[in-house]
């Protein structure tokens, strides 16, 4: 089988069309590329125009309630297409499909429901759909990693791509729905990962991001020879060795699992980007225990100190939840003081959203009033804005190597791209193309951007 026959979407006006909308995490973006690969092999072509689609798919997220509410709103929009054109198929795939299962089929809202481990069955499910017989497959697998399927890349710039190195999660944090929607943790054969990264580099890609719910627990066990087992640090090294011109990123790390070996490997290879996304969720050890995060405040701060001692220029970003069950004002203050201590580059910040079926939904009341959650979240957001600015100000005067991603949104005469530490730089164009590397000098900053000059 030729794994890499079509790395970009096929353009063919004669093929039936599939339209894919993706919600949620980077893993879902990569899953949509796997889905497209499977459907392209069945004779379909991707379209960006919903009006011409024969199949409309939403690849969904369940991490918070508002993510699901958005999809319910979109289903109403999709059904307009169904009324306009007979034979249009509407499918919900991904985590919301896994969580809600047959509820999505009630009232004939959609024709197709497929969970994250059921994408290989999509062609058969589509063939079996009739007006009276919608199709569903939400079986979770202990083996499926889609390792033999080459994703068809849907990115717009042709230089940055995602590679899924594992699926599922074994951590079962009390607030999180992911283990129930994506199943148990499975690591992918490292040789297929390296081959995929090599193929991307051969096709002009300059950056790959290795994806997993918890990349640090990646572990490939060789069935015959234990000396051929591969952990995450070893996998990182294998991908980094493809070429010094290929940047390697990864996400997401877990504070309890990020090892000294991973940090040391990053230090050895310059093309492994100096950025770690390390979700803290709360600065309170009491809350962390209740969340089942399996580390405390001191452990987290020690890991940050270790990263900075080995990689002083490493960007660190995080996730923070405001208003988890039973969170006191002191717990909230603990989060704020931890943020001030670490000075994160940026953060994803959310008010706690109780998810049905999780341990927290069964064990802990969602007892922080909406107004209080909102107040705490707004304090966290305001503080992070100041911390982002403080972090960026340390970059002033530095020279950074940047990968050009495209024109600046605000000024088409300027370019933008990220430095190794994941900070976004804006700088004057000097005729560079997307995918070129260039060195810039940081002259001034905002909380979100480094404004840079060019080296003459």
What annotation goes with each model-predicted range?
Residues 28, 64-67, 97, 255, ...:
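Alpha-helix N-cap/loop-to-helix initiation residues
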Residues 155-159, 169-171, 272, 282, ...:
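Short flexible coil/turn linkers enriched for glycine and charged/polar residues
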Residues 173, 193, 210, 250, ...:
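Conserved, mostly hydrophobic/aromatic
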């Amino acid at each position: 089988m030729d794994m890499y026959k079509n790395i970009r979407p096929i353009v063919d006006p004669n093929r039936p069309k599939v339209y894919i909308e993706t919600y949620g995490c980077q893993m879902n973006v990569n899953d949509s590329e796997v889905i497209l690969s499977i459907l392209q092999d069945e004779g379909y072509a991707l379209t960006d125009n919903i009006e011409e689609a024969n199949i409309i798919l939403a690849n969904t997220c369940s991490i918070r309630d508002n993510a699901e509410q958005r999809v319910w709103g979109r289903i109403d929009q999709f059904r307009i297409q169904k009324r306009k054109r007979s034979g249009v198929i509407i499918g919900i795939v991904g985590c919301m499909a896994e969580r809600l299962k047959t509820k999505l089929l009630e009232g004939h809202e959609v024709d197709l429901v497929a969970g994250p481990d059921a994408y290989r069955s999509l062609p058969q499910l589509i063939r079996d759909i009739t007006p009276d017989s919608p199709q569903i497959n939400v079986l979770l697998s202990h083996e499926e990693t889609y390792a033999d399927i080459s994703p068809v890349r849907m990115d717009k710039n042709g230089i940055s791509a995602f590679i899924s190195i594992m699926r599922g999660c074994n951590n079962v944090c009390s607030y999180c729905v992911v283990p129930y929607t994506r199943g148990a943790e499975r690591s992918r054969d490292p040789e297929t990962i390296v081959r995929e990264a090599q193929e991307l580099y051969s096709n002009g890609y300059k950056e790959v991001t290795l994806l997993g719910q918890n990349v640090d627990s990646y572990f490939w066990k060789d069935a015959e020879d234990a000396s051929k087992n591969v952990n995450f640090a070893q996998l990182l090294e294998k991908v980094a060795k493809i070429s010094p011109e290929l940047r390697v990123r990864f996400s997401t790390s877990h504070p309890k699992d990020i090892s000294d070996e991973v940090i040391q490997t990053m230090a050895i290879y310059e093309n492994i980007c100096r950025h770690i996304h390390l979700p803290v969720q709360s600065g309170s050890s009491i809350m962390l225990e209740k969340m089942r995060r399996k580390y405390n405040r001191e452990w987290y701060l020690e890991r940050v100190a270790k990263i900075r001692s080995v990689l002083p220029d490493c960007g660190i970003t995080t996730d923070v939840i405001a208003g988890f069950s039973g969170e006191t004002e002191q717990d909230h203050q603990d989060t704020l003081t931890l943020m001030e201590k670490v000075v994160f580059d940026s953060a994803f910040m959310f008010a706690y959203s109780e998810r049905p079926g999780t341990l927290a939904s069964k064990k802990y009341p969602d007892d922080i009033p909406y107004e209080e959650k909102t107040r705490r979240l707004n304090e966290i957001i305001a503080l992070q804005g100041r911390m982002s600015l403080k972090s960026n100000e340390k970059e002033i005067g530095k020279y950074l190597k940047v990968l050009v991603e495209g024109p600046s949104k605000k000024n088409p005469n300027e370019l933008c791209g990220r430095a190794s530490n994941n900070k976004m730089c804006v700088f004057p164009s000097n005729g560079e193309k997307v995918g070129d590397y260039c060195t810039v000098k940081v002259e001034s900053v905002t909380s979100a951007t480094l404004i840079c000059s060019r080296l003459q």
